[in-house]
Curated annotation (Swiss-Prot):
It comes from Homo sapiens (Human). It is linked to Ciliary dyskinesia, primary, 32: A disorder characterized by abnormalities of motile cilia. Respiratory infections leading to chronic inflammation and bronchiectasis are recurrent, due to defects in the respiratory cilia. GO terms for cellular component: 9+2 motile cilium; cilium; radial spoke head. The keyword Phosphoprotein applies. PANTHER family: FLAGELLAR RADIAL SPOKE PROTEIN 3, RADIAL SPOKE HEAD PROTEIN 3 HOMOLOG. Belongs to the flagellar radial spoke RSP3 family. This is Radial spoke head protein 3 homolog. The modification Phosphothreonine is found at T286. InterPro entries: Radial_spoke_3. Functions as part of axonemal radial spoke complexes that play an important part in the motility of sperm and cilia. Functions as a protein kinase A-anchoring protein that scaffolds the cAMP-dependent protein kinase holoenzyme. May serve as a point of convergence for MAPK and PKA signaling in cilia. Residues 153-162 have a biased composition (Polar residues).
Length: 560
């Protein structure tokens, strides 16, 4: 069976256009949409290595490596191709580390695998340049491509019999202007830190809520928050004190000042160090700036009359200069005349303006005087009207008060007179001046009399008590008579002399008390009243007994 080369090339182009890119390896198809491939594989003649169209003159082989198939290693048939998806010792979604990625493709090359132990599930690669292969659209020869380890085999495989189709994608068809700008950079993530990749024991799978589409407002708020945080961080970095910039001719260099090897000890070693910098050197004088020479000095000798004839060529120039000078002088004269006319007109205008300004000022002053006179007369008229109204109100109030008080005054004056607000001056003088003095004098006289009575009562009481004692003593002496106690004896004479001396002493004390005004003033009224009450009570108790005792004592004294 032979096929034309043109037909084989067209089939290769169509198959290349329908090619899909698989990024998942042995895990199956990727989630990327179908993309037509613009690049077309270079056309191969029909007699090159191709599994669909073997060359007539030689056996099938690999067109990528020009290697012949292994003897007795390939099989015939047209069964559906099977891609190896698992092998012992590795995860189902990861190919063996020593095999090429082409082994996990959908249509592996049949010329680079050999059967092991005659089974459809055991194939081994025989070509180390399988990455040069491209996926073909035709069916390879009948074989099962499965990889196994030396110790174990894969129990099952995955087959793909459905036609290629675009898988549903969770991305939106059109870009959202709010959440994703036009030129948003593509973010790349590390699959080792992706939360969607399950690690460890799949039996203890953590099931959580699916991540829904984020809200546009929330994304905008997060973006604004990040911008504010970045701006705040930049402001803090600007405000942070930094090392000043180096002077001209110098630069800052990071220098390791600590020891590279530090000894770890129980006690920290303390060392005192000092550093003295050199004194500041005097600034050298600034050299004068001398610019560099940029041109070249060239000398040229020109003889007289060599370039031009001065007398001949100066005439037109001189005519032009003289004409321009005369024209300029005429223009200056005209300008001066024009300026003089302008100054004259300005002077006339100034005079007219000054006269009009004086007239305006006179009229303004006249208007001001008229306005002030008007305001003054209005104020005077208002004051006159105000005074007239106030006077009329006062007259009306006075008439009303007189008419109202005509009957009220007599009764008010009578009540005030009865209350004592209207008084006789003579009577008032007697009440204020004479009666208080009279009461004071009477009170003094009464005090003197009360003091005299009190003193007299005290003297009488003392005499009576003494006579009573003497009388009682005399009765005792009568019961036991002795010659010296007779009535006419010396004892009686002694008692009479003592009594007379006591009476004289009491009388002298009474006179001194009466003459002593300071004593009367020092004695309070309460003390006098208490003493007076006391003496009156004692006097009432004694009564007639005291009088009789006093009479007896006086009689005995007279008899003696």
């Amino acid at each position: 069976m032979t096929v034309k080369p043109a037909k084989a090339a067209s089939l290769a182009r169509n198959l290349a256009k329908r090619r899909r890119t698989y990024l998942g390896g042995a895990a199956g198809r990727s989630q990327e949409p179908e993309v037509p491939c613009a690049a077309v594989l270079p056309g191969k003649p029909g007699d090159r290595n191709c599994p669909e169209f073997p060359p007539p003159d030689r056996t099938l082989g690999c067109w990528a490596t020009d290697a012949a198939p292994a003897a007795g290693l390939c099989g015939a048939g047209s069964e559906p191709s099977i891609a190896p998806t698992s092998c012992a010792g590795n995860l189902p979604s990861r190919p063996p580390p020593l095999l090429s990625p082409l082994l996990a493709s959908r249509n592996p090359c049949p010329w680079h695998y050999l059967h092991l132990s005659g089974s459809h599930n055991t194939l081994a690669p025989t070509c180390f340049k399988a990455k040069l292969h491209r996926k073909r659209g035709s069916q390879p020869p009948d074989m099962a491509s499965a990889l196994t380890d030396r110790t174990s085999r894969a129990p099952s495989t995955y087959t793909y019999t459905s036609r290629p189709r675009a898988l549903p994608c969770q991305r939106s068809r059109y870009r959202d202007s709010l959440t994703q700008p036009d030129e948003e950079p593509m973010h790349y993530g590390n699959i080792m830190y992706d939360r969607r990749v399950i690690r460890g024991n799949t039996y203890a799978l953590q099931t959580g809520p699916l991540l829904g589409r984020p809200d546009s407002l929330e994304l905008q708020r997060q973006r604004e928050a990040r911008k504010r945080a970045l701006a705040r961080k930049q402001a803090q970095e600007q405000l942070r004190p930094q090392t000043p910039e180096p002077v001209e001719g110098r630069k800052h260099v990071d220098v390791q000042t600590e020891l590279y090897l530090e000894e770890i000890a129980d006690r920290i070693i303390e060392v005192d160090m000092e550093c003295q910098t050199d004194a500041f050197l005097d600034r050298p004088p600034t050299p004068l700036f001398i610019p560099a020479k940029t041109g070249k000095d060239v000398a040229t000798q020109i003889l007289e009359g060599e370039l031009f004839d001065f007398d001949l060529e100066v005439k037109p120039v001189l005519e032009v200069l003289v004409g321009k000078t005369i024209e300029q002088s005429l223009l200056e004269v005209m300008e001066e005349e024009e300026l003089a006319n302008l100054r004259a007109s300005q002077r006339e205008y100034e005079e007219l303006r000054n006269s009009e300004r004086a007239e305006v000022q006179r009229l303004e002053e006249q208007e001001r005087r008229h306005r002030e006179e008007k305001e003054r007369r209005k104020k005077q008229q208002w004051e006159i009207m105000h005074k007239h109204n106030e006077t009329s109100q006062k007259i009306a109030a006075r008439a009303f008060a007189q008419r109202y008080l005509a009957d009220l005054l007599p009764s008010v004056f009578g009540s005030l007179r009865d209350s004592g607000y209207f008084y006789d001056p003579i009577e008032r003088d007697i009440e204020i001046g004479f009666l208080p003095w009279l009461m004071n004098e009477v009170e003094k006289t009464m005090e003197y009399s009360m003091v005299g009575r009190t003193v007299l009562d005290m003297l009488i009481r003392e005499v009576v008590e003494k006579r009573l004692c003497m009388y009682e003593h005399g009765e005792d002496t009568h019961q036991s008579p002795e010659p010296e106690d007779e009535p006419g004896g010396p004892g009686a004479m002694t008692e009479s002399l003592e009594a007379s001396e006591f009476l004289e002493q009491s009388m002298s004390q009474t006179r001194e008390l009466l003459l002593d005004g300071g004593y009367l003033q020092r004695t309070t009224y309460d003390r006098r009243s208490s003493q007076e009450r006391k003496f009156m009570e004692e006097r009432e108790l004694l009564g007639q007994d005291e009088e009789t005792a006093m009479r007896k004592s006086l009689g005995e004294e007279e008899l003696s």
